[in-house]
Amino acid sequence: RAEGLPHGVVLADAGYGDLDAAKAVLEERKPKSLAMTFPGGTHDLWLRYWLKAMGIDPVDAGIEIKPVPPPDMFNNLNQENVRGYSVGEPWNARAVVKGKGFTAITSQDIWANHPEKALVTSTGFADEDPETLEKVMLAIFEAQQWLDDPANVPETAKIIGVPKYVNATPEEIESRLAGAYDLGGGHGEKDFGDLRMRFFRDGEVCFPAPSYLLWAMAQYVRFGYLTELPDTALADELILSDLYASVAATAGVTVPDTGMAPLEIALDDTTFDPTDPQQEASRP
């Protein structure tokens, strides 16, 4: 999935995907605040990981990282309440369309085909009404496969590009959903091709791999949200692997055997070993 980290045009000298240039600009211009959607959420992790990869500690650099609801991101950038933000589409595209921002890097540049959203329920619901939960999961499987077809991108943009859903224009949504990015800031265009935002990818996208959870917990330690790693058994407690496998079989969806495979993070050329998350948690 490709999501942008846009910044106001005042930081456009940072270029696209250039960590050295971005670091130089951030250190010179000293932005006081950057935004993400929710503390500990994926967009928070992408932003903090990007800064870490440049050797920038937001506290030492005097950068406040603050939560802003996704639909309010552009207005906060436009009003200079923040100088940049990490959020899902189409709010990155809006900054480009309005000429107020550019895409500095996308989450696909950080970690290709990374995990994102999850279906989360209470233990009570999962235990007391498994039939309804299974129906919801089957519906999601069906929707994911439909959304993954490039031919359905225009219709998807029209369906969700209305006030009661995303409240953005279909034009803002469609190009990024298709993986065709105008980066803004005079940085040209980029076509992500097969690395565009995906929803199924033969069952790979929807697979709740324990390694993903362990990677996130390691980042929580790196970024100061946790003082130490929880027991790794927590992954098995939180992920209902047996239920997923059962519903996937009903839907004819392949369950990958990569749940504990190493993860390759492109941005800083690291490999995460899920059997030893402490190694990642201890990394500067």
Predicted regions and their residues:
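A bilobed periplasmic-binding-protein/Venus flytrap-type ligand-binding module shared by bacterial periplasmic
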Residues: R1-A2, P115-E131, W146
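Short coil/loop linkers at secondary-structure junctions
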Residues: D57-A61, G101, V166-N167, L226, ...
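Ligand-binding pocket segment of bilobal, Venus flytrap-like solute-binding proteins
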Residues: I63, P67-T103, S122, K158-Y165, ...
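Conserved C-terminal helix/tail region of periplasmic/extracytoplasmic solute-binding proteins
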Residues: L214-P284
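A polyampholytic, Gly/Pro-enriched intrinsically disordered region
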Residues: R83-G88, F125-P130, K135
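Secondary-structure end/capping motifs
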Residues: E128-I239
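Short gly/pro-enriched beta-turn/loop segments at secondary-structure junctions
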Residues: N113-H114, E155
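Short, glycine-/small- and polar/acidic-enriched structural segments
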Residues: R1-K66, N76-A93, K100-N113, E264-P277, ...
